[in-house]
Amino acid sequence: MFCPAPGIPLLATTYNLAESNNAGRADIVLPGFVASFMRKLALLVVVACLSFIVLASAQAGPGQTGQNPQIITVSQIHAGMRGVAYTVFEGVKPEAMEVEVLGVLHNVNGPKGDIILVRLHGTKVEYTGVVAGMSGSPVYLDGKLAGALAFRIGEFSKEPIAGVTPIADMLEISALDRSPAEETSAVKPSLSAVAGQTATPGETNSLPGSAQDSDGKDFANYLKPIETPLVFNGFSEQAIHLFAGQFASAGIVPVMGAGSVSDDKQPEPLEAGSAVSAVLVRGDMDIEATCSVTYVDAQRLLACGHPLLQFGSVDLPMNKAEVLATLASPLNSFKIVNTTEPVGTFVQDRHTGIMGVFDRQPEMIPVTLSIHSSTGVKQFHYEVLNNPKLTPVALMVTVFNALHGVNEFGEEITYRLAGSIGVKGFPEVTMRNMFAPAENGQPAAMQAAISLGERFGRIYDNPYNAPDIAGVKLDFDLVRERRWARLESARTDVTEARPGDNITLETVLAPYRGERIVRQIQVKIPTSASKGTLRILVSDGETLDHMGHANPAFGRKLDLASTIALLNKEHSNNRLYVSLLEADPEARVGDKVMPTLPISIMNVMDGMRGNQEMVVSGESSVDETATAPLDYVVSGVQLLTITVK
């Protein structure tokens, strides 16, 4: 039986056989049935040779297991080699695609980061092109594992040309176990997670020259990772749109509802080429990303061929996945996926791929969110990943989505929040606030989401302790009116007072489209008050908190206990506060305040300013009084002065 030599295209072989048959007719006239037989024989020869080549290339294909896979190194790969790749186009069974090596691109994926450039052949792949979700699909050359499909070329490509991450680079991930140093790095805060730097929805925290920087957004169009879109299920289009900037700054491309998550059993085992999903949020709302398995054995698997987020050590649910359909698009073909039963945990997210281990449960953060209204109670139960960079954003988008996605939602809505964040080994972080549409037009639901995200950013932003979040509980009471009031004026009944005297402040609040409210506040001048000018600050709680944030102490890193203590001391926004300010030095040590220090003590402490938890300021708050809750979100500041005799 005739078979083509290695490296000769099969289509060319078919043409030569047919041409030889036609050439024979010039000299010899064969009976019709003989000619027909010869044509069928030629076709059978081609089919047999094709099967032989595919089987030879796939001998260590999807079924390959074991601790040491047979691999082929980049130095052994050259242009013209042919092999096979596997991916799922529909269902759960990987399908073969013919692979033709075009060459090797050196140092294009970082220092010493080589990429194998290949052209894919096959009816389906030539129709769909390189597909989002195909990254990780294993490539075999000479029957050995060469690597994973991981890169595509440009936009609107007319040919399915892809880049392959060498398997040797991916196997390095297996050597990265979760050492103590690695565990510590996994929870260190990133630039976009630090307190006070949680970007407003619609903005990003990307650095100049980053992939998200508008001036350089197209720099990587020549060769870039095959997209692994993060699919949002149970989310409104507005929620995804408003928070797209935050996810973009983390390297995520949000996609609305192109699949789902369920606990349905999928009896088929994972194999090389199978679809596998990493889950960031699961429950009544789902966020997941799907790529393909490159290598699998009894304990672990490697997938993607490029990073999901490149967070290093991670702790994400690893689920099987079923491809419902592959949608062809000139811009970007993608797979529509159902994520099914969990099988383990992704523990590494590295430059050349992600690694998961079987039979390990990930540590997620459980969230219970309740919305109380006149029509009853609606509850949402879900879990979010535990990650310094993404957890605050995931909580913001899920909270906004839950509040925005109920029928009771409207522009003239106020929420009363009673909530808590459980941190193992520390006191709960309590939250009691109100949120109403403000003068700047920001919806109450967005204010609530940002408030929660900012708290989580501060919990993660400490260099001393890795927070172990036990859970989040949020109870919202929905009021169908805008309960917001501005502090219009404040005055006192005296201009002079003595230490120990009681004075009365009269404040006027102007509610949104309502009658003015007058409140009288009794204030006692401290017996320790110094003679001279005493400033009286009448304000909302947010102003006092911002004054503390502006203090240099707020920019210094505190341990987790001090951070939680400060969070629990923050002021409610439905009260008026009266603060008495003296022109005496004040020292802050962590979450503790020492007001009105004598000059001698201040001079000593001033020399300790280098201490990361010691800050001396020139003004002291000697007393603070608050009204009872007003059932309005209060906004405004008034400053009065009296003379202490």
Where do the protein language model's features map onto the residues?
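Bacterial N-terminal signal peptides
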Residues: 44-54
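Terminal presequence/propeptide segments associated with secretion/organelle targeting
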Residues: 56-645
